[in-house]
Amino acid sequence: MQFEIPAPSTTFEVPLEDGARIRMRRHGNPDGVRLPVTHGNGFAADAYFPYWRHLLSKFDVLVFDFRNHGQNVPVVPSNHHYAQLARDLERVVQDTKSKLGPRKTAGIFHSMSARTAMKHAIEIGWRWDALMLFDPPDVPLKGHPLYEAMEIFENKLTEWAKGRRRRFASVDELTEEYKQSRATGRWVAGEHELMARAVLRRSPDGSGYELTCAPENEAAIYAQALTLDLWPKASEFGGPVKLIGCDPNFKGAPATGPANQALGIEGGYDYSFVEGTGHLLQIEKPDECIRLTLEFLGKHGLA
């Protein structure tokens, strides 16, 4: 099986404060509730198509990648840190409203982008009618019983990313690498090839392909997860927030599962988890994630 991303009805670029640009792709129903959809660290939004394709018939879906990811041209210096990502998100929000007009909007974010959306909403401002957070790498404050588990988790990811291979002769090479990994064993059929296509770009020197998100940029974000001091209550946001974690009880589940369950309970969130999933739940069990998405949006008059 091979996924084919439909051509967007509209594209536009959002210029960022340092000259970087984010390429926005509009899909679906332009008259529907607007749903910006994006990705986690080192990944790319097109790879989440098994999830967001189910939204196209009803919603105005805006697909985009954060700086130095996906369809965006990497910049030097990279300015690849959470404070910058939050400011970038504000630019995306404001430019989208300016170009496409105001519209009821629910942001859908995963992992790094979910953490960015939390920081943006708490520190810059609430810009949504609702916010959906899929398995953000929520690190409790020091002294919390789960802090150490998240510290170990993020440090392991940081070291892994630093040693990650960055160049490939073909898309197939990375596809096979994904297929050989235990961590990707639950991805839906066709996802390994889709992910490889989404995260690679042609090497500027014309020799094969390279990761759009350089390993050092990916590693920096994992390391910064431990520095944010961001463990907010749901009441600190300016509107409804849905927190959806991976399975906290799953054998071998990442530390994000128990951490998000703890935040959900302690912070008074509308919290759910998707049974039998790891961190990439939207591409492991997209149908269940869509069910939770539509349920939450409907609850707040957005579906």
Model-found features: residue ranges?
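Flexible "cap/lid" loop of the alpha/beta hydrolase fold
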Residues: 122, 129-170
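Gly/Ala-rich beta-loop-alpha elbow adjacent to hydrolase catalytic centers
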Residues: 109-113, 117
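Conserved loop-alpha-helix segment in the C-terminal half of the alpha/beta-hydrolase fold
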Residues: 235-277
